[in-house]
Design a protein with these regions (language model features):
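Short strand-coil-strand connectors
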Residues: 4-8, 31, 116-120, 143
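A short, N-terminal "cap"/entry segment at the start of jelly-roll beta-barrel domains
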Residues: 11-14, 33-35, 40-81, 116
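Short acidic-glycine-tyrosine-enriched beta hairpin
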Residues: 7-21, 118-135
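Conserved short histidine dyad/triad with adjacent acidic residue
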Residues: 70, 83-100
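Short, conserved beta-strand element in jelly-roll/cupin
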Residues: 1-2, 88-90, 99-114
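Localized chelating/binding microdomains
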Residues: 51-54, 68, 97, 105-108, ...
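Ligand-binding loop in jelly-roll beta-barrel domains
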Residues: 13, 22-45, 134-155
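A short, compositionally biased micro-patch
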Residues: 21, 31, 79, 90, ...
Length: 155
């Protein structure tokens, strides 16, 4: 990625995240091509977690730790219309079936889990994604230790 008027180079790899301040010039150059997710936060009143630094390449999975027998989570960024959360599930832990308060996408960052969605089970592994519709009944159960990002669009 080339960031800013001076086109400072930032190399990113699979699973990396790069935060670019709004109204900052940026571009992408590759030798082999790439696929990336771009999230544009248009509201000024968003709450960015202070562990995230602009212009610094990070691995999302490294921002959260596992705790034995439980699920941990941290908000990365949120405002009244969206939320991006990281979650780490210890082996065998999970979220019981519940309805999504908005459209959502899961980003599997490490390990694998079983996603229950509207009566069907789906296995998701690191590098894969899964979408829920608003009010979709879903659950998440770790199959081994599992880390994920959750982008939730609130209306």
């Amino acid at each position: 990625f080339l960031i800013g008027a001076d086109a400072a180079k930032h190399t990113i790899s699979e699973g990396d995240m790069l935060v670019v301040p709004s109204l900052t010039l940026c571009g992408v150059t590759t030798e082999t091509g790439c696929i990336y997710t771009e999230i544009i936060i248009k509201k000024e009143n968003n709450n960015m977690n202070k562990i995230i630094k602009s212009g610094e390449v990070i691995k999302l999975k490294d921002l959260i730790s596992y705790e034995d027998g439980s699920i941990t989570n941290i908000d990365v960024v949120s405002n009244d219309t969206m939320k991006f959360v990281l979650m780490a599930f210890d082996d065998g832990t999970g979220l019981t079936p519940h309805r999504a308060p908005g459209n959502a996408i899961i980003f599997a960052l490490e390990g694998k889990a079983v996603i229950g969605y509207e009566g069907k089970d789906y296995t998701i592994s690191a590098g894969e994604n899964f979408r829920f519709d608003k009010n979709g009944l879903h659950s998440v159960t770790a199959d081994g230790r599992f880390k994920m990002g959750l982008l939730l669009v609130l209306e």
